[in-house]
Curated annotation (Swiss-Prot):
HAMAP family (alphabetical): Ribosomal_bL17
Transmembrane segments: none
Protein name, per record: Large ribosomal subunit protein bL17
Gene responsible for this protein: rplQ
Signal sequence, start to end: none
Gene Ontology biological process terms, A to Z: translation
Lineage of source species: Bacteria, Pseudomonadati, Chlorobiota, Chlorobiia, Chlorobiales
One family name in Pfam for this protein: Ribosomal_L17
InterPro entries in alphabetical order: Ribosomal_bL17 (IPR000456), Ribosomal_bL17_CS (IPR047859), Ribosomal_bL17_sf (IPR036373)
Self-association and partners: Part of the 50S ribosomal subunit. Contacts protein L32.
Keywords: Ribonucleoprotein, Ribosomal protein
Region of interest (Disordered), ranges: 124-152
Family: Belongs to the bacterial ribosomal protein bL17 family.
One GO CC term, this protein: cytosolic large ribosomal subunit
Amino acid sequence: MRKVKSARKLGRTASHRKATLANLSTQLLLHKRIETTEAKAKETRKHVEKIITKAKKGTVHAQRIIFKTIRDKSAIRELFEDIIGRIGDRNGGYTRIIKLAPRYGDAAKMAVIELVDYAEMPAEQPKAATTDRSKRVKGSKKKAVAEGTSAE
């Protein structure tokens, strides 16, 4: 009897989806926080939580299994040396998804996925607010306006 698969397709072929999740997982392990669409963040969460749980065993066998999906040695080194040490005795729930405003170009639902124990890391600095240039009056216009009101 046919059963429904629980994973999202993300509008990709199976190989493309597998590569996308591997890349997102690698970047999350390296940078501790990434911004992506909400659907990709939810799938990445499932993927990364399983990887971290396997890595907590700390065996060579666990490293080899994880290396099948995450093909970046620096990410695996970071996982086994730094991330596992910070996680400690936490039983699951290693990641957090924070929803953001929709993306400007296509209104896609955006989210930030981050490792929970790295939340105190400084977020990207917000860009300086730009002034509204439509309200500014240039010097020559100021003089003309001032002269026009004083003449009346």
